[in-house]
Amino acid sequence: MKIINLGILAHVDAGKTTLTESLLYTSGAIAEPGSVDKGTTRTDTMNLERQRGITIQTAVTSFQWEDVKVNIIDTPGHMDFLAEVYRSLSVLDGAVLLVSAKDGIQAQTRILFHALQTMKIPTIFFINKIDQEGIDLPMVYREMKAKLSSEIIVKQKVGQHPHINVTDNDDMEQWDTVIMGNDELLEKYMSGKPFKMSELEQEENRRFQNGTLFPVYHGSAKNNLGIRQLIEVIASKFYSSTPEGQSELCGQVFKIEYSEKRRRFVYVRIYSGTLHLRDVIRISEKEKIKITEMCVPTNGELYSSDTACSGDIVILPNDVLQLNSILGNEILLPQRKFIENPLPMLQTTIAVKKSEQREILLGALTEISDGDPLLKYYVDTTTHEIILSFLGNVQMEVICAILEEKYHVEAEIKEPTVIYMERPLRKAEYTIHIEVPPNPFWASVGLSIEPLPIGSGVQYESRVSLGYLNQSFQNAVMEGVLYGCEQGLYGWKVTDCKICFEYGLYYSPVSTPADFRLLSPIVLEQALKKAGTELLEPYLHFEIYAPQEYLSRAYHDAPRYCADIVSTQIKNDEVILKGEIPARCIQEYRNDLTYFTNGQGVCLTELKGYQPAIGKFICQPRRPNSRIDKVRHMFHKLA
């Protein structure tokens, strides 16, 4: 059986949830379609999902059409950052991108299409709501060509009389895009030679599979118009990315969820082979797991199963597997564009309105962060505050919605701040000697520190011989140094430097590894004071698409937001601006873009890295440590 993993993507109110229900209903998977208004749909059941068009809880549902099984996978992704959208698409074999016939191309549509193109995922356009009044389809086509891609092929005609209907487009003009993109076909056309329809269809299919040609279909999901034709196209056009004839197992975890009873489930895409109940599967060089229970999506529901075939989705109860964990032979994993998860760039504190809900909040954050690599949290051991690190404002909206609707927790969140970093300005050394006040530890430690190019991270080297200082003491020094790097002179993480352990001395038998572990961060701090540090802040690459009249406004606003516009291009009555901007300014820049373009502007962002901060230095309160703070202050007085 052919299995296709399909994503349905759309901007808010384009009809994604209604289309999913219509596909299930028309295929016979369900007896009647669910209602968005009544909250009976199988996907997007949370309030924020409906309001913002954001998928929060992954829902995998499926239907069967003849000998083809189609898994519909909702693709969660924080629209703040492209990297997260890319990650959520990596499991798909193909996508249907909805365009509302009434609303046309929206900003979110363009962001999603940009991601689909980057990932080279075969994509069909489905123009929904064609039965509404005042629809101008030729204008929608022009807008698609101008704002999405000129490489579209309209596969259907929409009739108006005696009632709205959808039929196949048999005009030869539809093939112009296919002919113009192929030299051999173009040469035939120019010389007046006849075409074989099979030649055109073969070239159309080749470019569709490569993600460079986009067929356009039409319908009304609400009234099940054009849905049967869409199902037939999905079943015939999309291929599974699973290699044929490969019996060895390969699967990858793409989602982690917790049930209401707090059971942990992992979603696995099987790329090759077959997974059986009671199989023992390798997940690393040293670790294996036994499959004791498994479910697969079948006709709109999840059912227990003894097997999961190549290409299918399987849900396993498991406490060991992590996001992106590989089951079986990782060599068989398809080679797709690798998207590295960006670092969280914002942080804030979160608290409960009712003190008795604190433990529930901590448990909820543990579960949410387990399935979201862009969310991290810790509890300050002294203030007991819960500190969240995250990527963007949409992500925080999602977290709050999940806390309220799934865990019934009311949370208060402070205004977030950007996460800065510190980098030494110059090379420096510092040594604290044993039995020299105010050193209370039975250890001597000497460290040197020097700056490295931005983006290098922290490099550590010991220049003290193991014959002179044994491994346990050396390990303790490294642990202390890494702990000291967590907070520099301004309270931010230290990065982009090389730290060398230059000198160490111990007294036998009184010295212990703890002496070296506690002294090392104090020595590091003194070395940093001699070196001085500069503050680094996260910068983003941005790409703005906006009406031409926005150009002067963009240049006018750029200095206010510390933005640097590096290139400008005019295309199809639109201006394309590329540049760099501090992460702390992007939200206001986006808000202004939306306001001045009446929602037509699109801003795509990707993390560039850290650069020297502009403006005044922002300090972060140092986390207390009762074991070393007194000694730190004593050395601070000596300085």
From Swiss-Prot:
Highest taxon listed in the record's lineage? Bacteria
A Pfam family reported for this protein in Swiss-Prot or TrEMBL: EF-G_D2
Residue ranges constituting the tr-type G domain according to the UniProt record: 1-244
Q: Does the keyword Protein biosynthesis apply?
A: yes
Q: Name one GO molecular function term.
A: GTPase activity
- Which keywords annotate this record? Antibiotic resistance, GTP-binding, Nucleotide-binding, Protein biosynthesis
Per UniProt, GTP binds at 10-17, 74-78, 128-131
Gene Ontology biological-process annotations: response to antibiotic; ribosome disassembly; translation
Write out the similarity annotation.
Belongs to the TRAFAC class translation factor GTPase superfamily. Classic translation factor GTPase family. TetM/TetO subfamily.
What is the documented function of this protein? Abolishes the inhibitory effect of tetracyclin on protein synthesis by a non-covalent modification of the ribosomes.
Record's protein name: Tetracycline resistance protein TetO
